């Protein structure tokens, strides 16, 4: 049965077609917002996957290049692996959806979103987010939805609901908020130092808009939604928990997890698990789920310790940060390096500077963004958690963590005019026990400062956690969560910022949303903690950016020329610019607007190249003194080169004060001589003189 629904959303029409396409999917919706079209589907396997202790949810966001009238690049001329934007969008969709599936559901579920056309006024990422929630809501897949998402931009202090792509790219706020009918369930933000109060206001304006979308989804579900199918529960039987408590009492489990040493805790749990394995040796069903059962036993113990007893596993107070350490310049010869340690989480960040020709090229659906100047890459090797496995390159988690730390620093980076460099920061995880992305933010900030990047302000990040009870008022917010509190808690609320405001937020949640008091307390806690980190730790390692770039970094000078003179600098088939490069050893980049960047390791060579470019692009003025090289000798005079492609002639009568019969009597090829420009002769040609050069020139 085909039905079409529509609603007005932020001044544009959102249209949803159900039953028109993809009838074999569990749920499908074809959405059009303006002229942006996205096909969203939800499918689930018939049976649970054996031998797993997690919910196997996959989310895909497919960018089809035909959506913007492009043919993909490369030899294959078809879409390849997912872009960074696709991965980040899929993660944003995953985070609010995952908590709304049953906790004991183990069937494979795939949410697929295919972008089929793009209207620059309506961002496809937002449409896909709404589409995934709707397709799942009307399907027969067990799901405690719907949820809805809204994006908020800001320009000149005014909020923009669901901004256009241009408004999103150029605004001061990039906020995405997902909500259920009662609570906020996901927050993702990048911001130009937005004050905490303004950010909270924006979050709850999104929450209000979400309620209209949820009402729209509920109407569709009531009319054509499928009944939810029955499924095989993978819940641990209560009698198994009772037997486990007989073998290891809650007090013994509490003693096992109550330590600030991650390795000690893991060894304690390993020994406890061995006891259970011996006791349940003849019960194959219980052995099959023992790992999940031990996890849940630990979880109940830790949550009770925190919520009821106000005891954290490592003995810290609720608002206490782990021991901190920071240092810079630990790696020689690189352009900038720093290490930041928080408890058993340790990040080493290394910054590399390069000319602007090294910026990352982006071929995506957003035609406003074709390059990326600042790149932050995050690596998470297995040794950082004491494990052994081969490295297969960055996964979605690594890409997500790198993007978060990147987003945190972008607002404080200098402009291209102020600092004409491409910048790459790489965060290497040396040790991990929670919140490595926030440690990466702190380390990369210090590394940029050590490299001489003139960032406007210092940035730090911290994460807060949460443990909730049976009611909305029964909760405890934790500052600086470690791994165990992340695993067994309900929230990972990451916030980065300066002293003056927030630059990034990422909220991961395991429950059905947060009340406003929790959101406000978490944001307030993170501000207090990040200010402490900057003032008491980071600023003592490096208080401000170095005045000059590192000695091993390339030096870059930038000048601006008349765009009409670009051809003179380049020369026929690149002859002139290649000659400048060959003579000086520098690298030259020229934009269409006439911005010329000259990059090299030798300041003298850079200055020489810039002088050449200035000579090439500047008309000679009467009285101007120049140095030229004799490149040709004729009977009537000598030709001098002042820069590649820029020559002038000195008549034989202007070479020496006394009369000479032959130019060769005074000049030879390759001689460097000073000349003065005499202006134009009767024929309109520029003439030069050697003999009229002032003695003090």
Region annotations inferred by a language model:
Residues 113, 185-190, 231-235, 244-256, ...:
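Short, hydrophobic beta-strand segments
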Residues 27-29, 37, 122-141, 327-351, ...:
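Conserved phosphate/anionic-ligand binding catalytic regions in large, soluble enzymes, centered on
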Residues 103-109, 144-146, 213-231, 283-290, ...:
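Flexible, glycine/charged-enriched surface loops at secondary-structure junctions
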Residues 25-110, 115-117, 122, 188, ...:
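Glycine-rich, flexible beta-strand/loop modules in the N-terminal catalytic cores of phosphate-handling
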Residues 1-232:
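Long, basic N-terminal domains or extensions that often function
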Residues 290, 552-558, 563-697:
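Single-stranded RNA-binding regions, centering on S1/OB-family and related RNA-binding modules
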Residues 1-45, 49, 53, 232-369, ...:
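Extended amphipathic alpha-helical scaffolds
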Residues 140-260, 448-547:
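Mobile "lid/hinge" segments at catalytic clefts and subdomain interfaces of large enzymes
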């Amino acid at each position: 049965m085909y039905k079409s629904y529509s609603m007005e959303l932020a001044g544009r029409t959102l249209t949803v077609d159900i039953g028109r396409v993809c009838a074999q999917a569990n749920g499908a919706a074809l959405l059009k917002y303006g002229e942006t079209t996205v096909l969203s589907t939800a499918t689930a396997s018939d049976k649970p996957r054996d031998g797993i202790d997690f919910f196997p949810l996959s989310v895909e966001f497919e960018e089809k290049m035909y959506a913007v009238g492009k043919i993909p690049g490369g030899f294959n001329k078809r879409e390849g692996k997912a872009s960074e934007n696709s991965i980040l969008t899929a993660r944003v969709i995953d985070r609010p959806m995952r908590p709304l599936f049953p906790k004991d559901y183990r069937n494979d579920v795939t949410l697929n979103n295919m972008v089929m056309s793009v209207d620059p006024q309506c961002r496809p990422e937002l449409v896909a987010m709404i589409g995934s929630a709707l397709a799942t809501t009307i399907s027969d897949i067990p799901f405690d939805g719907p949820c809805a998402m809204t994006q908020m931009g800001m320009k000149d202090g005014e909020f923009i609901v669901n901004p256009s792509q241009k408004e999103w790219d150029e605004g001061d706020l990039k906020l995405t908020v997902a909500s259920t009918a009662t609570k906020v369930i996901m927050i993702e933000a990048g911001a130009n130092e937005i004050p905490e109060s303004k950010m909270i206001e924006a979050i709850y304006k999104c929450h209000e808009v979400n309620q209209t979308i949820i009402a729209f989804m509920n109407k569709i579900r009531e009319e054509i939604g499928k009944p939810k199918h029955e499924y095989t529960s993978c819940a641990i039987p209560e009698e198994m928990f009772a037997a486990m408590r007989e073998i290891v009492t809650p007090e013994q489990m509490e003693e096992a997890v109550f330590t600030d040493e991650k390795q000690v805790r893991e060894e304690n749990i390993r020994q406890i698990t061995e006891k259970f394995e011996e006791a349940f040796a003849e019960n194959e069903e219980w052995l099959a789920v023992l790992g999940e059962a031990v996890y849940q036993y630990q979880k109940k113990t830790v949550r009770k310790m925190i919520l009821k007893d106000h005891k954290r596993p490592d003995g810290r107070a609720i608002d206490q940060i782990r021991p901190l350490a920071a240092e810079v310049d630990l790696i020689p010869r690189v352009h900038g390096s720093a290490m930041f340690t928080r408890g058993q989480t340790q990040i080493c960040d290394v910054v590399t500077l390069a000319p602007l020709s090294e910026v990352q090229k982006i071929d995506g659906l957003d035609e406003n963004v074709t390059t990326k100047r600042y790149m932050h890459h995050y690596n998470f090797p297995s040794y950082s958690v004491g494990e052994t496995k081969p490295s297969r390159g960055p996964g979605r988690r690594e890409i997500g963590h790198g993007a978060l730390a990147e987003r945190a620093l972008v607002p404080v980076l200098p402009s291209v005019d102020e600092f004409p460099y491409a910048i790459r920061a790489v965060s290497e995880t040396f040790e991990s026990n929670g919140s490595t992305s926030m440690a990466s933010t702190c380390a990369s900030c210090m590394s940029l400062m050590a490299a001489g990047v003139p960032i406007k302000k210092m940035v730090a990040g911290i994460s807060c956690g949460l443990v909730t009870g049976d009611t909305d008022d029964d909760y405890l917010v934790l500052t600086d969560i470690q791994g165990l509190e992340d695993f067994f808690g309900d929230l990972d609320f990451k916030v980065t910022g300066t002293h003056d405001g927030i630059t990034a937020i990422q909220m991961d949640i395991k429950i059905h949303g947060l009340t406003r008091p929790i959101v406000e307390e978490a944001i307030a806690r993170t501000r207090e903690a990040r200010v402490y980190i900057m003032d008491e730790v980071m600023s003592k390692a490096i208080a401000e950016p170095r005045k000059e770039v590192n000695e091993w970094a390339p030096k870059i000078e930038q000048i601006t020329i008349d765009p009409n003179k670009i051809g003179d600098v380049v020369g026929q088939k690149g002859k002139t610019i290649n000659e400048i490069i060959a003579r000086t050893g520098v690298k030259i980049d020229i934009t269409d607007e006439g911005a010329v960047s000259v990059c090299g390791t030798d300041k003298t060579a850079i200055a020489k190249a810039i002088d050449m470019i200035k000579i090439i692009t500047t008309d000679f003025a009467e009285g101007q003194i120049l140095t030229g090289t004799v490149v040709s000798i004729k009977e009537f005079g000598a030709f001098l080169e002042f820069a590649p492609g820029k020559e002038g002639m000195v008549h034989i009568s202007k070479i020496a004060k006394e009369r000479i019969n032959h130019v060769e009597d005074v000049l030879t090829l390759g001689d460097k001589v000073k000349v003065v420009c005499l202006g134009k002769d009767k024929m309109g040609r520029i003439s030069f003189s050697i003999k009229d050069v002032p003695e003090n020139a």
